């Protein structure tokens, strides 16, 4: 499909991205219309998708999207959680109209309802999950593009891009690749330079994992602030200027108390039957009398 043009050939970094995201890994079941997209089957029963066919169909889908004059007439739909973020990012990059979440029945066929819309091209993430828009597209002769796994039904699908449409990384990478090729064919970005948008922005993330990461980051920031607060110098608002005192002994007046001289006694000469409780009482009386000046 890419012809003999070297510019449209699949690069090595693209192959590495496909392999890292698991785009080549299909399911254990195989639809008869997807047989010519299969490269081989593993010993555990998983079918391996031929990435060369994936790249050719990706370029064909990009050419079909570029052929639409008004980018807003391209409808991109994903009812599954793994493709909703990728669909919104693709629409923001290419100007398409996204429908992330539940598709309202009758959007393409019921002219009475307020959500009625007539797009010129439909791109879905999963033909099995997005069967309602595919069925309505067949009623209004709307061309369709779909990311198809090995067990996906190809009914009402005009351009099937064989890939792993179950994994969050694979779905995000396929929408990123499709958006990049559309922008390259429009001339918005150059093929000589890599696209500055990373594929990680198209990946689905579980809200619970995001909350856990935010809580861990907040706890780490709090502990870091506490650690810095213990070792940093006190702020100037808490420092008070103290008067300079040349001699600290002059600042405090201590009352002078005469020191009494007690005769030295020979403890060995006292009898062993002496009452020890009487001696402290007499001394305590003297100390009380000596310290009357303090009061």
Swiss-Prot record:
Keywords, A to Z, come to: Acetylation, Cell membrane, Cytoplasm, Membrane, Nucleus, Receptor, Repeat, Ribonucleoprotein, Ribosomal protein
One GO molecular-function entry: laminin receptor activity
[DE]-W-[ST] repeat positions: 230-232, 247-249, 266-268, 275-277, 293-295
Q: Where are the annotated segments for Laminin-binding? A: 161-180, 205-229, 242-295
List the residue ranges of the region (Interaction with PPP1R16B). Answer: 54-113
**CC annotations in GO:** cytosolic small ribosomal subunit; nucleus; plasma membrane
Which compartments does it reside in? Answer: Cell membrane; Cytoplasm; Nucleus
Q: What does the miscellaneous comment read?
A: This protein appears to have acquired a second function as a laminin receptor specifically in the vertebrate lineage.
Name of the protein in its database record: Small ribosomal subunit protein uS2B
Organism, scientific name? Homo sapiens (Human)
């Amino acid at each position: 499909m890419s012809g003999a043009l070297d510019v449209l050939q699949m690069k090595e970094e693209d192959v590495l991205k496909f392999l890292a995201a698991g785009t080549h890994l299909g399911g254990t079941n195989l639809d008869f219309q997807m047989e010519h997209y299969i490269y081989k089957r593993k010993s555990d029963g998983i079918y391996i998708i031929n990435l060369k066919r994936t790249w050719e169909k990706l370029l064909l889908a990009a050419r079909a999207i570029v052929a639409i004059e008004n980018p807003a007439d391209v409808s991109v739909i994903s009812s599954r959680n793994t493709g909703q973020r990728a669909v919104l990012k693709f629409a923001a990059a290419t100007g398409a109209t996204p429908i992330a979440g539940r598709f309202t029945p009758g959007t393409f066929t019921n002219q009475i309802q307020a959500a009625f819309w007539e797009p010129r091209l439909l791109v879905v993430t999963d033909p099995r999950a997005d069967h309602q828009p595919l069925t309505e597209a067949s009623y209004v002769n709307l061309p369709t593009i779909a990311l198809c796994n090995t067990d996906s039904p190809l009914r009402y699908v005009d351009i099937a891009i064989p890939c792993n449409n179950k994994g969050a990384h694979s779905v995000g990478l396929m929408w990123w690749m499709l958006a990049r090729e559309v922008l390259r064919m429009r001339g918005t970005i150059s093929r000589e330079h890599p696209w500055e948008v990373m594929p990680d922005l198209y990946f689905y993330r579980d809200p619970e994992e995001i909350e856990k990461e935010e809580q861990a980051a907040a706890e780490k920031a709090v502990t870091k602030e506490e650690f810095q607060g213990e070792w940093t110098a006190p702020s100037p608002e808490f420092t008070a200027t103290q008067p300079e005192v040349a001699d600290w002994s002059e600042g405090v007046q201590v009352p002078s108390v005469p020191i009494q001289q007690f005769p030295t006694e020979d403890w060995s000469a006292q009898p062993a039957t002496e009452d020890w409780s009487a001696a402290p009482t007499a001394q305590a009386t003297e100390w009380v009398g000596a310290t009357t000046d303090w009061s």
